[in-house]
Amino acid sequence: VYIRFDYLCLIFETLNIKITTLMLQKTFLARCDNRACLAKTNIMSGSPEAWLSNDLLSKSNTFGLTFDFFVDWAINQISPYVWIKRILLPTYTYDEFIGKLDSEMEKEFGKDYLCRLGRFATEYDMQIQFIVFHDELDWSNDRNELLIVSLSFKEGCYSFSPQKYSLSGFKELIKSHSGGPVSIGSKGLIYGTSRLECSLSKTDSLYPGDADLLLLNEDNKAVCILEFKKHTLSSPISEQCFTNYYPRPDGRKYKRLALLRDYLASKSNSRILFFVLYYPTQTYIEQQWKLEVIEGNAFSLRATDSFIFELPADKSDNEYKKVIEKISQVIAARS
């Protein structure tokens, strides 16, 4: 049955049901050469992003942040900029978004999340910036524009400062934060979270990598970095281990995360843990996930312990809570 959207709105208005229209949407992982081809996921259990959502984490006085961050590779140190990206829907202009900036940011992220981000930035001496862009644009054209919205946080209140950048200016900003040009080769990424990221992966202004999840405690202190490692093959999850990927082919990725761990630890004078969580996308192999504890300095990392658990039997909150409990137990044993 097809119902016109304006008729649907009239029905909702008559029933006093409010429709919240969002200008922003999250980026998503898909093939760079075909954005309709999404990355594989486990259809029975879902993904760690769902298992460890803030709706569930908050019930155990824990909070998670996901963001992109920079390493200045000229000095092997963290550049204090946190980027959080969002796509602006094509029906809205940048100026329309700026005109409703406060309300749209609050609708997308929530006031509590924004306050936590602000406190985190203050505690760890970092600048939070939101990268907002029209992803349908031709990102090979250096004249195309995007928006950077900087978050300020003073005396418990946040505010936003937007600034438009041309793609050429954005590339220079990436190089500045990265300690110079940075690339992965002319072929670029196979999978990316946006057309923008995919396009930049073929240049010497590579979009920064991410922290899949940084866990904060009830005092907003960083506790643990979690890297999610998707297993798409048919081999047992028990065969997934750190030495499969470190020091090659993913040494730089893990070095980045270890440098972030060390930066945060130095700012808070506390120990921060580093885990890799392996999970399968295939449903015909044994349904388990694996957690490895990673230790050592950023230039010489190693796995010191590992644990294997049953995957969530379904996509229910009760099953996901079991994952949170297992991770919390491993953290508690090492705190």
Predicted regions and their residues:
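Acidic, metal/cofactor-coordinating or nucleic-acid-engaging core segments within structured domains
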Residues: 109-112, 185-206, 234-282
